[in-house]
């Protein structure tokens, strides 16, 4: 009996020994402060588009080259070089040139071809003037003639043949002939090969 009482006493003392009064307990640690993570808005990367450029060309050539790519789906270097070579043969990219070499305004060229591609037939020549009258451009200027050249129905008719790819300069000369209807071929094909060497695919 005495042993049992002693055991109960020790058990009570043990429980009391491990009990701690509430006022002696350390206060709980506060929760950690939230960490602010900066959120950056998602901005999709702009597509970087490469185009054919001609760093060594004259400003007039560079302008026409850029406009052709901006307003058509021509991406093939040979196709662009063919068009450029033909313009070089026709006018050397001089917009106010009348056939024979005279530099005159649109209404002062009385015979032969006129302008970038030497518009010769009465209808095509007159349509240049009508186009610029309707759209507020100068038919003697590089800008006005380039706009008309790209939008002219004859060019639009053969444009799909230039918008393909993988053809040679000689092959692209076929739609170029249908487009321009030249009488003398001259050096247009040689000029085209020269442009192929000068065109660079750049951002």
Describe the predicted segments one by one.
Residues 70-74:
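Helix-boundary and loop/linker segments of multi-pass membrane transporters
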């Amino acid at each position: 009996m005495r042993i049992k009482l002693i055991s109960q006493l020790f058990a009570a003392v043990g429980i009391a020994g491990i009990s701690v009064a509430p006022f002696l307990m350390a206060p709980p640690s506060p929760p950690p402060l939230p960490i602010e993570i900066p959120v950056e808005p998602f901005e999709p990367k702009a597509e970087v588009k490469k185009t054919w450029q001609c760093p060594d060309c004259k400003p007039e050539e560079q302008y026409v080259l850029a406009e052709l790519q901006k307003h058509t789906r021509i991406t093939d270097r040979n196709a662009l070089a063919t068009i450029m070579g033909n313009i070089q043969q026709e006018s050397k990219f001089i917009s106010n040139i009348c056939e024979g070499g005279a530099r005159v305004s649109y209404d002062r060229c009385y015979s032969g071809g006129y302008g970038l591609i030497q518009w010769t037939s009465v209808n095509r020549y007159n349509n240049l003037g009508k186009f610029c009258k309707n759209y507020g451009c100068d038919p003697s200027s590089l800008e006005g003639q380039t706009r008309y050249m790209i939008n002219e129905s004859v060019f639009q008719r053969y444009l799909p043949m230039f918008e393909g790819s993988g053809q040679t300069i000689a092959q692209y000369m076929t739609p170029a002939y249908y487009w321009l209807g030249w009488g003398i071929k001259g050096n247009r094909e040689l000029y085209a090969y020269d442009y192929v060497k000068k065109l660079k695919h750049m951002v």
